[in-house]
């Protein structure tokens, strides 16, 4: 079966077909400053649309926490990125329990919407927007839906809103067709990258070192704690400590400047998660700053290994085999 795997990352859009990987830069922002970060949604869609050829199935992983608003089926905003923090000085008119899988923070879409002045009747994640443009159906997997702040992952209920929300799926399935290709529910890029890095049966910590960094642990069922209880695959929880020092900051500093900061940052994160015996560090940063990371992890006293090669595309390939939900 001819499959196309597309990963919409923060820096690049990558795709894989018949074993060959390609990439193109993610579009530059139209708005970047004063806490705002917007990208032309049409430009993103045109890139994705242009990738689909005579494929039979298309699988997506997408950056999370961003959104596009629609009115009468047409976009009325740019893509408001996860980098956008317009909600920073906004008092939320809602509360979120741990069951929503996300905390209230400046880039939370649900909070960001309180600042919007445009008229809209439908909300899309980036993943559901791309699927909507391809199939006419606004739908996505819960790993992409939950970061918006509208979905209770534990009860599998959604908020009642005056506007339409994406149809959330707790399994990965075909949503509709674009030409001859079946379009599958998009999944969160963090979850896809971790699946690709450690496989479906891994138990332990995962230090995901991309543009942003997270420390995660995969546990069965729904788990509460001092972390975001993000949905994962097969009904598992991706216990996630967010907003750690990642590639965006590390690229701008020397090892000497960063060492103590990373020890403190990652050490605090480890204390928030249930105790585990091993850690896998993965992501693009591993290739470039391994010596620094070894020093930090040695200091923290964890049993660790590195995985430089696997990414979200590898996770999507596992998804395509039907081995996980």
Where in the sequence are the language-model features?
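Phosphate/ATP-binding catalytic cores across multiple sugar-kinase/actin-like superfamilies
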Residues: 50-52, 190-193, 257-281, 315-319, ...
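Glycine-rich phosphate-binding/hydrolytic loop that grips phosphoryl groups
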Residues: 189-197, 242-245, 250, 260, ...
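A short helix-loop
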Residues: 97, 111-119, 132-137, 163-168, ...
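N-terminal glycine/serine-rich phosphate-binding loop of ATP-dependent small-molecule kinases
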Residues: 1-77, 182-185, 276-279, 294-306
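Gly/Ser/Thr-rich active-site cleft segment
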Residues: 96-190
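Active-site phosphate-binding/coordination module
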Residues: 55-108
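Conserved phosphate-binding catalytic cores of ATP/NTP-utilizing and phosphoryl-transfer enzymes
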Residues: 1, 113, 176-204, 315-320
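Short glycine-aspartate micro-motif
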Residues: 3-7, 57-62, 79, 123, ...
